[in-house]
Amino acid sequence: MVLKYLKALTSSNDNLEETLLNVYLERKQNFEIFENRSSLVKQEIEKLSSSPSTIQISTSDSDNNHYSITFSSGYGSGVICKRTGMFFNNSLGEIELNPQGFLGNTYSERLISNMSPLIVSNKESIYALGSPGADRISTALAQVIYNYINNNDWSTAISKPRFHVNQNGSVRAEPESIEDNKNVTFTNANDMYFGGVCVTGINDDVVAYGDKRRGDINWTN
């Protein structure tokens, strides 16, 4: 979905909001298996007093190894695939994607995940990146990659204001991210709603970039 959002951002379509909404609806219609998702999610949310949080860890070293993982508290199978270092997911237990509960109506069906840990590269460098943020993960990553393509600076790409088009066509946006209209609800700048993209990689040296929306955590040694 990140690639679909990125394609929408780079298209020449004059109505960007409509294009992004169509991507969202394509995801819902073709990749989500529950027609009653909206009402079931609402019921489950009302039952919850709190929800677990998602973390993104991006790591790179001077030997050109790169690692990206997006993980939620209370989720995951606890099993790593041999010789790969990859965790098996357990999206069957993710309420947003499977509101009917663990193993509910999933036989022979393919479940999606909002999580999008990425390894991206250009001719000079390789980078690991990802973000928490539920269904804003794809749009946050697409916008950051789009910004990087335009300015070749990860710090600037991460800090630029973001917006997200919801299923109903409404838009939540940080100031100066999109033109104001009747569909837009503006948040504060650097709102954690829009994820927390973190990037590591190698330029001339190992680099790391955090996101002010989620604590701006980064460390190099």
Where are the model-predicted features located?
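Internal maturation/activation junctions in enzymes
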Residues: 1, 5-72, 81-84, 184
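Hydrophobic, well-ordered secondary-structure elements that form the walls
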Residues: 2, 64, 117-119, 141, ...
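Alpha-helical support elements that line or immediately flank enzyme active sites
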Residues: 3-10, 129-152
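Short Gly/Pro-enriched turn/cap motifs at secondary-structure boundaries
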Residues: 47-50, 106-112, 188-192
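Extended C-terminal subregions enriched in glycine
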Residues: 63, 109, 141-142, 147-191
